[in-house]
Amino acid sequence: MTRLLRLVGLLAAGVGLAWAVDRWLGGRQRPDDGETVPDPIRSTIEIGVPIEQVWVRLAEMERQPEWMHDLKWVRIQTPGPIGVGTRAEGLVRILGIGVGDPIEVTEFLPPHVYGISHDGLFRGSGVFRLEALDDGRTRVTCDETLIAPVLPNLLGLIQAPILGRIFQADLERLRDQLEIEAVTIPA
């Protein structure tokens, strides 16, 4: 019984410490609306195909799981062509946990900007920016912001390096798929 009480006490102290650290981290960032928002996680890559080809693949929501490793599926819920206001539901694995990810397209400027909001348990936003380079290549930059449902400041600090590697690997997978297709599929 004494061991159990010690364990409960340590657990309570750990939760209290995590809460205090989270509040302290949140106090360092004070946006206008009072909600703490972590810095975006930025990933960038250059792809050896023209911007139009990159855009077509990037904007095909239902094919995004082919290159986004932790995105298991996407179902579009809004009829018609994809554009601002299009809603979809996805299943994403965040740090190994399957989570529903309702999204809405917030920016859609072909072939340059594709932005979404995440409206599920993990809230936030993502914006892909495409830039045509002089040699027929395309630079893709992704800024992703995710806000955890509990201890958002502390978990944001912990998740940034992990998710940064995952998001960069996703862009590398997109690049590899597009560059292989450019070589193997005749124009």
Task: Locate predicted features.
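Hydrophobic pocket/interface hotspot
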Residues: Q53-L58, Q64, A88-G90, V105, ...
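A short, structured loop/turn motif at beta-sheet edges
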Residues: I51-E52, P79-I82, T106-P111, R129-R139, ...
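Hydrophobic/basic alpha-helical segments enriched in Actinobacteria
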Residues: P40-I47, D70-W73, G96-I97, E131-D134, ...
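Short beta-edge strand/loop motif at the mouth of beta-sheet-based domains
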Residues: E62-G100, T106-V113, V183-A187
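Intrinsic-disorder/low-complexity, polar/charged segments enriched in Ser/Thr/Lys/Arg/Asp/Glu/Gln
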Residues: P38-E46, R87, G100, V113, ...
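Hydrophobic/aromatic beta-strand elements that line small-molecule binding cavities or substrate pockets
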Residues: S43, I76, D101-E107, S125-A132, ...
